[in-house]
Amino acid sequence: MADSSLDQAKQAVRTQIWDALTAADAVHDASVHGRIPHFKGAEEAAARLAELPVWKNAEVIKCVPDKAQLPVRIRALEEGKTVYMAVPKLATAKPFYLLDPATLPVPPAEAAQSRVAASFAPTVDVDALSPLDLIILGSVAVNRTGARLGKGAGYSDIEFALLMEAGLVTESTTVVTTVDALQITDIRIPTTDHDVAVDVIVAPNKTIVCRAPHRPSGVLWSDLAAEQITAIPALASRRRPSPAG
């Protein structure tokens, strides 16, 4: 499938899910299109996630900064877990915020908010992160094979690839997404080699374990546009020179 056709197919799935969420009044967003849905069952999904052994055993997690995953970040900090959260658009040389539950200047419910975290949390480079026990992603759509779609910017995939190359995640690192049940689709989700699939889907009323989800082995430079690399310092600083000739 050509890139343009692939993008169109992905966008068609996103639009279907956004429309379904809007019709069901299942989100807090005034307009959910173009966003990771802030679904109304986010707290229930976080509570269900917190019952899983993979959560209970995790000491260090990376979680997206989206509103839908705020209850996950709050729980993690309240339970003494270290939380890494990406700087918006990975736009700084040190692209992750470090939320250390032992040194928070405000309660976890405040510290976990992305804007508050940005006001106090130190930023760290990829190589300075501790190995991750668990990764929590937001999604627009996900199917039972673990294939997922974000809002289309690709930042979660880039983060994962950078962490994979740094040895901070492995094939066995669990990746979870929390979603509304309406975001779980039986539609085939078109994917590419750089797309990160999830191991576990957690909705307010169900948990789905996915088999053999796809993982990129690292940064697929040929899939990145020059302007993407330039805009993300962590990529630009790690780009390997092209072979001479």
Please give the residue ranges for each predicted region.
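Amphipathic alpha-helical interface surfaces
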Residues: 45, 72, 155-159
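A short, structured active-site edge motif that brings together acidic residues
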Residues: 87-92
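Short, contiguous, pocket-lining structural segments
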Residues: 5, 9, 37, 41, ...
